[in-house]
Amino acid sequence: MTLLVTNIKELLQVREQNILKVSGSEMKELPTIKNAWLLIENDKIADFGTMKNMPKITADQTIDATGKIVLPTWCDSHTHIVYAGNREQEFADRINGLSYEEIANRGGGILNSVKTLQDTSEEEVYEQSAKRLKEVMKLGTGAVEIKSGYGLTEKAELKMLRVIKKLRENYDLPVKSTFLGAHAIPKEYKNDPDAYMDLVINEILPKVAKEGLAEYIDIFCEKGYFSIKDTHRLLSAAKEHGLKPKIHVNQFNSIGGVKVGVEHEALSVDHLEVMNDEDIEVLKGTRTMPVALPSCSLFLSIPYTPARKILDAELPLALATDFNPGSTPSGNMNLVVSLACIKMKMTPEEAINAATINGAYAMDLSETHGSITKGKMANFMITKEIPSFTFLPYAFGTNSIDSVYINGKLI
């Protein structure tokens, strides 16, 4: 099956095969081809170029993209798409003045979702989660990471991870799985959090690894949740089981989470709303990808990740949604890209790089996804007729996506 897209107004994120991420000042550059064509063979990108120099090609299907822009699908490297129910009451509570911490102390927050998840069948959790996955795919997401973390018992955590596995089996986009048993301390362990860490490390983690249910390990390294000591313990144990770290750090406080992530060669450190100079220095020269989650900052009215500080230090940066029922009930990467420009002062070029090639890197996918590169998977989207790619983040409330292709097939 061959698909030819012609008369493309601008083809974005055109890269050579050896580019796996972009950092600092490199992120200001977004390689493009104007008045372009793109050839897909089966599920991969076969060739591309300018219309002026297009050879004679016989394709099974041809699409005229006059006035439209083509770019890789978004790579969302941090989500909690698998959950049950919603938490709209807490949304109202926050409007009425309660903080994230106060809601958690009243039995809301993560523990609210935990109870709902535990009480919901695996089949129902799958059905609810599949709807969300289909929704974000229609919005242009072509690769996604999904975490557990609303189970907090062996049975419920394994249930979540099996749902993630089923989503991966039933949908064509890459679905990466992360074990986040250390998301919050269950009520029954409130007075003995070390015992809960023992459960996660000694009981649940070995079963997750044995069943091959996760590629990554995560922990909410934050005051009131899990300490630096806890993080060291868990990441050390996970390494023995072959799970790479991708961890929550610096959402509300800088307590050394970035440093411990780097020490354990984390693939990514995520959130980073609170960053000091030491955190920036620790990341220099490492392979760890900083990941910002601006729609979480929007929803919770908390600071935004200091993107300019990160990029001016010549570090890379990825963008993701943090899609979850409590702090970001949205998986819209288009909004994330807009917020990065509006609230984090990233240029459109920087934001698109962060949401494509760098997002792919933060999931170990940039060799196969995240750019228009010969031989990569044909995960791309075609916009509606728009004046330029800057219109994507500029028109923040408009759905400018016309069609989305995963593995060369229209979804």
UniProtKB/Swiss-Prot annotation:
Location(s), subcellular: Cytoplasm
Domain of life: Bacteria
Residues engaged in binding Zn(2+): H78, H80, H248, D322
Keyword Transferase on entry: no
Gene Ontology MF, one: iron ion binding
Binding site for 4-imidazolone-5-propanoate: R87, Y150, H183, Q251, S327
Cofactor note text: Binds 1 zinc or iron ion per subunit.
Binding site for N-formimidoyl-L-glutamate: Y150, N324, G326
SUPFAM superfamilies cross-referenced by the UniProt entry: Composite domain of metallo-dependent hydrolases, Metallo-dependent hydrolases
EC number of the protein: 3.5.2.7
Catalytic activity: 4-imidazolone-5-propanoate + H2O = N-formimidoyl-L-glutamate
Pathway: Amino-acid degradation; L-histidine degradation into L-glutamate; N-formimidoyl-L-glutamate from L-histidine: step 3/3
One term under GO cellular component: cytoplasm
Needed co-factor(s): Zn(2+); Fe(3+)
Biological processes, Gene Ontology terms: L-histidine catabolic process to glutamate and formamide; L-histidine catabolic process to glutamate and formate
Matching InterPro entries: Amidohydro-rel, HutI, Metal-dep_hydrolase_composite, Metal_Hydrolase
Chief place of localization: cytoplasm
Gene3D superfamilies referenced in this protein's UniProt entry, alphabetically: Metal-dependent hydrolases (3.20.20.140), Urease, subunit C, domain 1 (2.30.40.10)
Described purpose of this protein according to its UniProt entry: Catalyzes the hydrolytic cleavage of the carbon-nitrogen bond in imidazolone-5-propanoate to yield N-formimidoyl-L-glutamate. It is the third step in the universal histidine degradation pathway.
Protein name: Imidazolonepropionase
Originating organism: Christiangramia forsetii (strain DSM 17595 / CGMCC 1.15422 / KT0803) (Gramella forsetii)
Gene name tied to this protein: hutI
